[in-house]
Amino acid sequence: QLPIAPDAAKEYMPILIGLSIAGVIYGSIVALRQKDLKKLLAYSSLAHVGLIAAGCYTLTADGLNGAVYQMIAHGFVIVGLFFAAEVIFRRFETRKIDELGGIRSQASGFTSMFMILVLASVALPGTYNFVGEFTVLYSLSQVNIWFAVIGGTTIILGAYYMLKMFQNVMLGETNTKVFKD
């Protein structure tokens, strides 16, 4: 239980979880429409923070533990992704996803590192992010199964836009600028 205003926390729990999941949906939909690499990562981060908040508002031990796991894991992964995005920007002088591409053919080591970060961000089983997201979804299912179903659906949506971004940036048509490894 949360020690501050436990009665109010219990009363408003469904509303707060609903708002948190709405934040996840909003972040995911806006990230889907992004053409800028850093903006896509920022809205993806917003979606992850919404899931963290939903885990906190379940008022269960599993929800809080999952939220903490997710905070730590997301912190490490998003820093790596933003760092990689900055490296890409400094080499290509653009953040537009459509203008990037073919980095794999020029920098295979960088592509491998970026892929590991993307897979961690989408909570591939075996990553620390998976533990956090799975625990949060489990705690949401204890409160209301529909919260967990909607939360799980947004995770699939997140995997779609992150893997699509990876495909366009790393595997897409080769950019004319040289990316030195």
Predicted regions, residues:
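Alpha-helical transmembrane segments of polytopic integral membrane proteins
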Residues: I25-S28, F82-A85, A159-L163
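Helix-coil boundary and interhelical linker segments in multi-pass alpha-helical membrane proteins
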Residues: Q1-Y12, I52-Y69, L140-F147
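Interfacial and helix-entry/exit segments of alpha-helical transmembrane bundles
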Residues: A42-V49, V77-G158, K177-D181
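Transmembrane alpha-helical segments of integral membrane proteins
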Residues: M162-K177
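Internal transmembrane alpha-helices of multipass membrane proteins
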Residues: Y12-L59
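Helix-loop interface residues and adjacent transmembrane-helix termini in multi-pass membrane transporters
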Residues: A9, Q34, A61, R91-T94
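Structural signature of hydrophobic alpha-helical transmembrane segments
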Residues: D7-A22, Q70-F76
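Residue-level micro-sites within transmembrane alpha helices that shape
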Residues: K35-K38, A47, Y69-A73, V77, ...
